[in-house]
Curated annotation (Swiss-Prot):
Lineage: Bacteria, Bacillati, Actinomycetota, Actinomycetes, Mycobacteriales
Catalytic residue list: 98
Covalent S-S links between cysteines: none
Taxonomic source organism: Mycobacterium ulcerans (strain Agy99)
Name this polypeptide is given: Thiazole synthase
Subcellular location: Cytoplasm
GO molecular function: thiazole synthase activity
């Protein structure tokens, strides 16, 4: 039986698509995209949001019944990320955090050393930690061993739209993981989303692919459909790849000479 719900820690979600909020031109556009996506969990960069609701973003998520997932976007050290997560816990009354510790502004790739340090401290402090990490199976396993509730490997660098540049590594992460694997970053279009699920990911997190699309709401709907299609295809079991062609139906028809039926 296909397990339709996504389980992270002690919570279940009907949608396997997690949305980000960065890049939207305005809140009205963001609202249309969020509704079209069907998401139930959406990241919020705590350093860019007025926790009192001044930006309207938190109010919007509340109206839509979407759970905000604070993240530590922009942090460059473990100490900075831990402090940001603690502030988010106080402001939003949640111990869930998407952990980001970025090495530099040009690549926006995770700093593996600082990421693990931050994860260890936050887990010890009672957080449900979802770390944005490189597509490195060893690092993903290390983060799981620290007690992270999921691992979130990148498909390609944030905002590039390059899709999944190392699918084999994603498959290795999935094969070794004992926690949900959420592909995070680099998605460009719906086919990338479907591939992520076919590779074995439990969920997908994206923002730019939707918020900067020509029609964000339409792209959000496409991403939602692609995530569902990719997940169902994986559960259904694809046929094995073959070098040579194979007829879908055996050849059983026999031929006979004209007039055979009449006995002539």
């Amino acid at each position: 039986m296909v397990e339709s719900k996504l389980m992270i820690a002690d919570r279940s979600f009907a949608s396997r698509l997690i949305m980000g909020t960065g890049g939207a031109s305005n809140l009205a556009v963001l609202q249309e995209a969020l509704v079209a996506s069907g998401t139930e969990l959406t990241t919020v960069a705590i350093r860019r949001v007025d926790a009192e609701g001044g930006t309207g973003l938190l109010d919007l998520l509340n109206r839509l019944g979407i759970t905000p997932l604070p993240n530590t976007a922009g942090c460059r050290s473990a100490a900075e990320a831990v402090l940001t997560a603690q502030l988010a816990r106080e402001a939003l009354a949640t111990n869930w955090v998407k952990l980001e510790v970025i090495a530099d502004e040009r690549t926006l790739l995770p700093d593996a050393i600082e990421l693990v340090r931050a994860a260890e401290q936050l887990v010890d402090d009672g957080f449900v930690v979802l770390p944005y990490t490189n597509d490195d199976p060893v690092l993903a396993r290390r983060l799981e061993d620290t007690g992270c509730a999921a691992v979130m490997p990148l498909g390609s660098p944030i905002g590039t739209g390059l899709g999944i540049t190392n699918p084999h590594n994603i498959e290795m992460i999935v094969a070794s993981a004992g926690v949900p694997v959420v592909l995070d970053a680099g998605i460009g279009t719906a086919s990338d989303a479907a591939l992520a699920m076919e590779l074995g990911c439990d969920a997908l997190l994206l923002a730019t692919a939707v918020t900067r699309a020509a029609d964000p709401a339409a792209m959000a709907a496409a991403m939602s459909a692609a995530v569902t299609a990719g997940y169902l295809a994986r559960c259904a079991g694809r046929i094995p790849k073959r070098f040579w062609a194979q007829a879908s139906s055996p050849t059983l028809v026999t031929t006979q000479s004209p007039g055979a039926e009449s006995g002539n």
